[in-house]
Amino acid sequence: MENIISIVKKDLKEIAQKFNISKDPIVEINKNNIDSHFSTTLALMSAKELKQNPIQLAENIKNELLQKDYYDQIEIAGPGFINIKLKTELLSTTIKNITTLKEAYGKNKIKNKIINIEYVSANPTGFLHVGHARNAVTGSVLEEVLKFDGYEVQTEFYTNDAGNQINILAVTVFVHYLWALGIETEKPANTYGGTFYDDLANIMIQKYGDKFKNLTFTETAISDEETHQIFRKEAVQHFLTEIKQQLKDFGVVIDHYSSEQEMYDTNQIEKLLKEYKEKNATYEADGALWLKTTEFGDDKDRVLVKKDGSLTYIVPDLATHNIRIQRTHADVLINIWGGDHHGYIPRMRAGLQLLGHNPDILEIEMVQMVRLIKDGKEYKMSKRKGTAVWLVDIMEMVGKDALRYMLASKSSSSHMDLDLDLVQQKNATNPVYYAQYATARCHSILNQADQKNIKANLNVSNLLSNKKEVELLLTLDNFNQVIQMSAKNRAPQLICEYIQTVCKQFHSYYADTKILDENDVPTSEARLGLVLSVLQVLTNAFNIIGVSALETM
């Protein structure tokens, strides 16, 4: 079933082809003109190309449109804007489309393209913090948007379990282990903070007793190498399990977890360096091994292996991306990264191109910092201590739905202030409450209709005609366009913006209109169909962002 705006676009595209216009028509809901539904700038955009007067070209387009079945009135405004008014029966097909397709409404056809998204990828050194939460929401909502737009989507979590931070983690847990045994010792300044290390320390005592109590430690190592490896392995496994559970509680399930350590254990790093050498993509200088990234747009060549034989950060990153491309057969790789990675992108693309991959396969979406505000001040406290505000604490404070909604509501590329007091208010100033109240209101109306034995009419052609009904119908019809725009621009926040638009229009409509009128049952039945449509579209949108469409408040 085609939505209305797609029909208008298709008709205009046919006319454009007839007039040898190369540009694709842009069609928008006409919010400023109560006498028309859509507007297009096709004539204005194309007049110069065709060397025609834009008003005359607009008249020609108008005459072509009026030969179609769907258009009631076409007006030319200003220098060549075309305002389009539809026949009422076409408008009303929106309700039939929505109530027939239900949870599939807004979905696009299967595209036979695979997109692989890597997101969160937190170091397994502790709990998830609010920055990880924003990354998780950005990735999971984008995943659902892309699925809705017809893509096959795979998701990845890259586990940084091989670096020096894991050595520091092992020492951190070992110190807490000694403390739990009643042994007083000073914790190195570089180790991690948080009371959740006590939980793991107690688990280690249950499993191993006090057999390690006489060992010593430095900032990065336990004195016995075998014990050090035990603490590394146990800590990574513990916190990775914890991370998976916290993500699940937050509405995020990731398909595949890859391991940096596993790449070393299976000689993938050596294979990568060998492949670069075979492709003549490396050279030695100043005792180091360099990658020729300047050949493909980087501002300088990059060191792969330093003088002391140690690897630079880019080596495992290039290796995991090479493996990911080969394993997933994805058409596009999207990485959701922190904003501090921006300068890293050109060297990654160049490194992939030197392996023979299309550099455009890699897309990077940046997630900027989120600052929590409480009582008008920045909120930094956490009952689990440490240096961050933990996801589990914020969820306990405001709830999963409120946190997901607010984090999804702003572009991830901009810094964000999240007011914890605002999201707990039960009034229209709270966007989450305002949105969820709309679905609860729909359910309330449907329950009242049941009590009054009023049934929805989904086939009306002329009973939904007041300005606010038409406005709602056009906005509901536009859901698929919002999905396409959100997917194309990798902009999940557009879904929240759309939800707010629908809710604002619906609440305004409810305030001004007697939806259930026992003295006018036919109109009530038609309006009930509109309420069902609002509920379905909002439910679909809420499902995309992973927020509950509440039945009651």
UniProtKB/Swiss-Prot annotation:
One GO MF term: arginine-tRNA ligase activity
Protein origin, superkingdom: Bacteria
Family of this protein: Belongs to the class-I aminoacyl-tRNA synthetase family.
SMART domains: Arg_tRNA_synt_N (SM01016), DALR_1 (SM00836)
UniProt protein name: Arginine--tRNA ligase
Keyword Ligase: yes
Pfam families reported for this sequence: Arg_tRNA_synt_N (PF03485), DALR_1 (PF05746), tRNA-synt_1d (PF00750)
Organism annotation: Mesoplasma florum (strain ATCC 33453 / NBRC 100688 / NCTC 11704 / L1)
Gene for this chain: argS
Summary of subunit composition and partner proteins: Monomer.
Enzyme class: ligase
UniProt motif ('HIGH' region) ranges: 122-132
Signal sequence region: none
Reactions catalysed, as given in the entry: tRNA(Arg) + L-arginine + ATP = L-arginyl-tRNA(Arg) + AMP + diphosphate
Keywords: Aminoacyl-tRNA synthetase, ATP-binding, Cytoplasm, Ligase, Nucleotide-binding, Protein biosynthesis
GO cellular component: cytoplasm
HAMAP family in alphabetical order: Arg_tRNA_synth (MF_00123)
Enzyme Commission (EC) number: 6.1.1.19
